[in-house]
């Protein structure tokens, strides 16, 4: 190893930054025993700006990332064991445990559970220490997006959080949608910019997917047969599947996990061009937050599962919103939003948890709307010293 330098400020005396002698690797060692590997000049090194600055969003962002890391690690023990509820509980327990240590005044605005019905983190739940003077955050999260995938040992599962500091005059930056499902369409930045310039283009969740594919192919410089559409494999999406196949385009069907699927068309490392179909409404808000940071577009429209849900939405005052097309900015408003996720099993966005002897490796992404910086973080956790604080035990628990 080369020289070791202190990266700690007056109030941060727990970190050291070491410059490796080979391959341009930079090693950042935490007193907790975790090892974070940053390769070359990848911009993820800027994660450590929080050591030098007072920006509240920047200071706390790594703590949110640690929450998804812990959730991914703890739920990964249930990979392929056929118990998705246990995997979900493990992730929730780890996230709650991390939130208990965070000096924020947080409130869950998009969750997955109902109050008093574990394991989900319910809407309205207060998280953080709520210490005087601590920053307020609205929190949207999915402790495990892809619980079925985890239970079956399949790919495409992540733990993710979107957090926002509401801007002046805003009650909430992350829009709660009271429906179970939304019909969604997501596409890369090139397509989004083209639609902004010419709104008459048939780039709409209301348009036939065949028309969306044709115009997207022109904009992306591809043949229609080379356009890849990702679709959640559900009977309710059969009409989309049939259109894609009839047109001769490529189809990639997934069993679960439509947050990463909605973001896939905007990721440079995937060959997915479009995501279309009916998926979860809470997931639409999380993917909107991610796409606001990453670039790319999403449209979503409330999709009542049956007449009873439709009538309930009308009764609750949402009748005039049933035909509304929500864009990313409608679901994730303002510029004080961060998005982080950690892979549980491999997905288009992230690699999954890998345990090799005494080391667990996690892959995460951390993004902010304000800076538009996308940071990919590979963390090596020494299992001889690694602990996860769990809400259920209120203690640090060995992996």
Annotate each predicted stretch with a short phrase.
Residues 48-53, 60, 264-399:
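Oxyanion/phosphate-interacting regions
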Residues 100-101, 127-134, 142, 151-154, ...:
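Solvent-exposed alpha-helices and their adjacent loops that cap or buttress functional pockets
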Residues 63-66, 75-87, 91-97, 101-104, ...:
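Alpha/propeptide regions of enzymes that mature by internal proteolysis
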């Amino acid at each position: 190893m080369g020289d070791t330098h202190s990266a700690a400020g007056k109030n941060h005396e727990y970190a050291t930054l070491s410059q490796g002698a080979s391959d341009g690797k930079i090693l950042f060692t935490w007193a907790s025993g975790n090892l974070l590997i940053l390769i070359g000049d990848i911009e993820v090194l800027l994660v450590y700006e929080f050591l030098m600055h007072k920006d509240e969003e920047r200071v706390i962002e790594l703590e949110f990332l640690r929450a998804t890391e812990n959730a991914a690690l703890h739920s990964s023990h249930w990979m392929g064991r056929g118990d998705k509820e246990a995997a979900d509980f493990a992730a929730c327990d780890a996230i709650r445990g991390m939130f208990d240590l965070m000096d924020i005044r947080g409130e869950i605005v998009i969750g997955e559970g109902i109050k008093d019905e574990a394991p989900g983190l319910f809407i309205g739940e207060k998280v953080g220490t709520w210490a005087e003077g601590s920053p307020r955050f609205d929190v949207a999260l999915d402790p495990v997006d892809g619980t079925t995938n985890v239970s079956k040992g399949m790919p495409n599962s992540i733990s993710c959080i979107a957090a926002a500091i509401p801007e002046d005059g805003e009650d909430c930056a992350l829009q709660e949608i009271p429906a179970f499902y939304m019909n969604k369409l997501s596409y890369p930045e090139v397509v989004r910019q083209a639609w902004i310039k010419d709104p008459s283009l048939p780039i709409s969740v209301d348009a036939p997917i065949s028309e969306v594919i044709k115009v997207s192919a022109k904009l992306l410089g591809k043949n229609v047969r080379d356009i890849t559409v990702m679709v959640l494999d559900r009977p309710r999406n059969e009409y989309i599947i049939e259109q894609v196949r009839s047109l001769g385009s490529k189809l990639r069907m997934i069993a679960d996990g439509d947050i990463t699927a909605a973001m896939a068309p905007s990721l440079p490392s995937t060959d997915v061009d479009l995501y279309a179909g009916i998926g979860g409404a809470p997931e639409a808000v999380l993917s909107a937050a991610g796409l606001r940071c990453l670039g790319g577009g999403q449209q979503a429209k409330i999709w009542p599962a049956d007449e009873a849900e439709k009538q309930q939405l009308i009764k609750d005052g949402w009748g005039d919103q049933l035909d509304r097309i929500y864009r990313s900015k409608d679901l994730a408003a303002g510029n004080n939003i961060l998005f982080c996720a950690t892979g549980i099993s491999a997905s288009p966005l992230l690699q999954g948890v890998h345990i090799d002897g005494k080391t667990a490796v996690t892959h995460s992404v951390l993004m902010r709307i304000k800076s538009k910086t996308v940071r990919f973080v590979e963390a090596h956790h020494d299992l001889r010293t690694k602990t996860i604080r769990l809400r259920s035990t209120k203690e640090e628990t060995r992996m």
